[in-house]
Amino acid sequence: MNGTSRPGDPLLHATRLEKRFGTILALDDVSLSVPHGQCYALVGESGSGKTTLLRTFNAMVRPDSGQVTVAGRPVGESDPVALRRSVGYVQQEGGLLPHWTIERNVALVPRLNRRTDSLERARAALDLVGLAPADFGPRWPRELSGGQRQRAALARALADAPDVLLLDEPFGALDAITRVEVQRIFAALRERLALTALLVTHDMREAFELADAVAVMKDGRVEQVGPAESLLEEPATEYVRELMHKAGVA
């Protein structure tokens, strides 16, 4: 995605976003910037606006006011193909199409993006996440474990070599051992590929372990943004303090 950002500028930038769903104010004057190569986590209770904010960066949600940019280009003005090439998306429990093989699932994004080598890209992405294409490519999603399905979903998001990865509670449905395994794969790939990432999670420990900075949300607003140390040592509001305590990290 050829935007107008310069070195040092945030790759993801939201300015004074507001979004209503009927009478519910889901985003209330929200601003957030994520620098190149950083992983930020969005945390907060259910209904705090985390997923709504995440989805403004790939145009799944259109804010009523404010501006969202990726690499300096307003998302609302971006060509859909260019946006999909730049921004990968992993949803909770993967979202694999059950009647498609794993290889076809992973090839979906490059195919939508008009790539002529979509199968080659899919196989390379499966390799990236540790799923041998010859073995896992012909299988159906139901034949894979939960961890393998989520790795395939991660491969699909990476298949067109995006600059940005958006992840909506990607590890929440996994058992404890599998969760750690997939988290390690994500962390290694993020470093290897120099990805910028925005992660939604309910797990404060997960946020602290995987993210460079954490944004705490409540009632559609961002209460505080910063590295784990600043949230623990200098919580900006009583809500942030209580959230740290409830999560057992304070």
Where are these regions (language model features)?
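Conserved ABC ATPase signature
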Residues: 140-144, 148
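Helix-to-loop junction immediately C-terminal to a conserved catalytic motif
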Residues: 58
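The feature captures the beta-strand-to-loop junction immediately N-terminal to the Walker
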Residues: 43-45
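ABC ATPase "signature
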Residues: 225-226, 234
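Conserved ABC ATPase "signature" C-loop
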Residues: 219-220
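Conserved catalytic motifs of ABC-family nucleotide-binding domains
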Residues: 161
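ABC-type ATPase nucleotide-binding domains, specifically the catalytic core motifs of the NBD
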Residues: 78-80, 100, 104-118, 127-130
